[in-house]
Amino acid sequence: MEPAGPAPGRLGPLLFCLLLSASCFCAGASGKELKVTQADKSVSVAAGDSATLNCTVSSLTPVGPIKWFKGEGQNRSPIYSFIGGEHFPRITNVSDATKRNNMDFSICISNVTPEDAGTYYCVKFQKGIVEPDTEIKSGGGTTLYVLAKPSSPEVSGPDSRGSPGQTVNFTCKSYGFSPRNITLKWLKDGKELSHLETTISSKSNVSYNISSTVSVKLSPEDIHSRVICEVAHVTLEGRPLNGTANFSNIIRVSPTLKITQQPLTPASQVNLTCQVQKFYPKALQLNWLENGNLSRTDKPEHFTDNRDGTYNYTSLFLVNSSAHREDVVFTCQVEHDSQPAITENHTVRAFAHSSSGGSMETIPDNNAYYNWNVFIGVGVACALLVVLLMAALYLLRIKQKKAKGSTSSTRLHEPEKNAREITQIQDTNDINDITYADLNLPKEKKPAPRVPEPNNHTEYASIETGKLPRPEDTLTYADLDMVHLNRAQPTPKPEPSFSEYASVQVQRK
């Protein structure tokens, strides 16, 4: 009797167990021999280029697919599979699929972006009959570095302007560079700054950003200054990128005020000048106040440039002094760059008004300027006094010359006083026999000696009287209207006489 065979219903499970045991044995035996090799530990490419990731296996058994993953562990993500039917944009198989027993499973990533940076793994799977494929071997991984250039540095300053003496911060930022290594430094007018803080951040270790802040103390000379943020990276090939910021955009220099005046004009007007000096920027409004009341507003458009970058502005204000009978305070008020107004005062003091009109005296706030005006006034007064004195002396001298040239005096001298000069006396008892008249003619400058001329003459005067004088008369006056001058040829003399006499002969009855 032949033994009975296995029941038909039990044959299926038995075959399945045998096949499973054989598969496990074959997998164990071949697992010891299978090798997955990724020859390149790292690959670096520039953004936009293509990157090739190599992978080879030592055996095609056990049967199962090969897949590529980015990352490892639970966070890894599949990027490519050699099983047909799946589509992966930008990734292609670079192996020769027509080659028999092809063991090359390399891939190529085109148009690489910084987000593609990371570590990639080539993994061998064993195909499962019932269960999913099982990972049996992985390569060592290839790190992809995307060489991304940093963006141009962006430099920003404070939101509002600062004054000299204040400390302000500048910030420099650059984005999207890879790898992480980067160098950043600050320069001011060619000199490197040291007070800075720099941080580097990344987004999933794909690309990096850098931010740096530097502190600078402002000075009045910084209007023409600027700061430079310099970034150096391997992708720049020795040509660093620069970002700049000008101090002229963040500095404010407040003006100084000075009021001066010119002397009072004949039209009773005073010219006041407000000098606004060394300010920056140009944003300026000037107001003239009269005793606190707005009188005029200037919004200048033309300025005087200084070498240090600041500006000057001068405003003129004409004051009609005759319209004021009391002291007036004029104020120069300046509003600069939306800052609180600064002021400078100037007092104009009224003089006592006369019937012909009034006048005013300007009293500057500056004592030195006032003293200078006093010195000028004293000097002018002294000069006028000297001129008046010289004019008076000149007029007096002219008057004396006219008096000498237009008048002459004739006087009769008593004979007793001139007795020694009389050559002949007719009667000693009559004192009125002969009377001499002294003609004091104006003396002229003594002329230079010259040769006597034959026409030199002597002048005589004869006086006729109608009656005899009384004995008691001692003086006889001669009316010049009765004097007749006769010319006669005199004997030449070596030198002319300076006194002329007229002999008068009185006839007796």
From Swiss-Prot:
Oligomer and partners: Binds PTPN11 when tyrosine-phosphorylated, except in macrophages, where it primarily binds PTPN6. Binds GRB2 in vitro. Binds FGR. Binds JAK2 irrespective of its phosphorylation status and forms a stable complex. Binds SCAP1 and/or SCAP2. The resulting complex recruits FYB1. Binds PTK2B. Interacts with TRIM2.
Effect of residue 436 to F: Abolishes tyrosine phosphorylation and PTPN11 binding
Effect of residue 477 to F: Strongly reduces insulin-induced tyrosine phosphorylation and PTPN11 binding. Abolishes tyrosine phosphorylation and PTPN11 binding
Chain spans, region Disordered: 441-472, 485-509
Subcellular location: Membrane
Extracellular face of the membrane: 32-373
Protein name, entry field: Tyrosine-protein phosphatase non-receptor type substrate 1
Glycosylated position list: 54, 93, 169, 181, 205, 209, 242, 246, 271, 293, 312, 320, 345
Job of this protein: Immunoglobulin-like cell surface receptor for CD47. Acts as docking protein and induces translocation of PTPN6, PTPN11 and other binding partners from the cytosol to the plasma membrane. Supports adhesion of cerebellar neurons, neurite outgrowth and glial cell attachment. May play a key role in intracellular signaling during synaptogenesis and in synaptic function. Involved in the negative regulation of receptor tyrosine kinase-coupled cellular responses induced by cell adhesion, growth factors or insulin.
Motif SH3-binding mapped to chain: 446-451
GO BP, one annotated term: cytoskeleton organization
PROSITE patterns, sorted: IG_LIKE, IG_MHC
Disulfide bonds: 55-122, 172-229, 274-332
Residue ranges of the TM segments: 374-394
Keywords, ordered alphabetically: Disulfide bond, Glycoprotein, Immunoglobulin domain, Membrane, Phosphoprotein, Repeat, SH3-binding, Signal, Transmembrane, Transmembrane helix
Extent of motif SH2-binding: 436-439, 460-463, 477-480, 501-504
Domain Ig-like V-type: 32-138
Post-translational modification: N-glycosylated. Phosphorylated on tyrosine residues in response to insulin, cell adhesion or epidermal growth factors. Dephosphorylated by PTPN11.
Cellular component GO terms, alphabetical: cell surface; plasma membrane
Topology term for the membrane: Single-pass type I membrane protein
One Gene Ontology MF term: cell-cell adhesion mediator activity
Signal sequence coordinates: 1-31
InterPro entries on file: Ig-like_CS_Receptor, Ig-like_dom, Ig-like_dom_sf, Ig-like_fold, Ig/MHC_CS, Ig_C1-set, Ig_sub, Ig_V-set
Cross-referenced Pfam families: C1-set, V-set
PTM annotation (Phosphotyrosine): residues: 436, 460, 477, 501
